Amino acid sequence: ELLNYWYAPEQEFGLAVRTGWAMLRSLGFLLLIGHVKRGRVVAKPFGLILSVTTVFAVGRLVVPRAGVPPLPGLLGFAVLTALCVAVVVLLYRSEAVGAHLVRHRKGLVVEGGVISWREVVPKRPPVTGWLLTARVAAFTYSPLMLVPALVATGSILDGRISAVPAVLFWFAAGIAVSYAVLFCTAFLLRDRRWARKLLVVITLTTLAVDLPLCWWLLGADGLIRDGAPLVTAALLTLYSLHR
């Protein structure tokens, strides 16, 4: 990301925001490493959505507004894509990794008058991997809305005062989506049928709000760069719910 930012023709505000967001994903991969080390079941869907959205997040940085992408950026993107593919293949195709990812989170357990810190098996019925994937993918809606909203503040700094209400609405919608997804997925993991339908409604509403704002405030370039990752996450959510 730093190489691409350095070689970019224009180090503008939007590129800086997108570069920072892409670099924050390094923390996401550290979190993924922690989940794998502890054998957590959630590592598979988390690794899948993290890898897919990372490729999109960095890919939109490589392509300039005009001309051909610089060679260092292309090489870095190729290496990053290969690494993300390797992560997904290991999580979903490796029998050794699959046999390791069977643990649940630890917590305080009171049994026989003794308090201990150990693995807590959820009381709810076993959750399928696709439901977990839908949950993790849906949780990306909020940041994928807030990042372009932050990019759009650059137009306000450039004197486009008329965009203030739309940008504020964009931020509010991004925050509201996070709470809606949190509420919905809590019941989704309990396999409530209405929660599936509600998540579909949330997904379609998110797209209906975010994509027009991307086009209006960021143009066709912003629609592709910032809309495509959200569309990908939405399609993955809908596909996971269908499975």
Question: What does each model-identified segment do?
Answer:
Residues E1-R243:
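Topology signature of small-to-medium multi-pass alpha-helical membrane proteins
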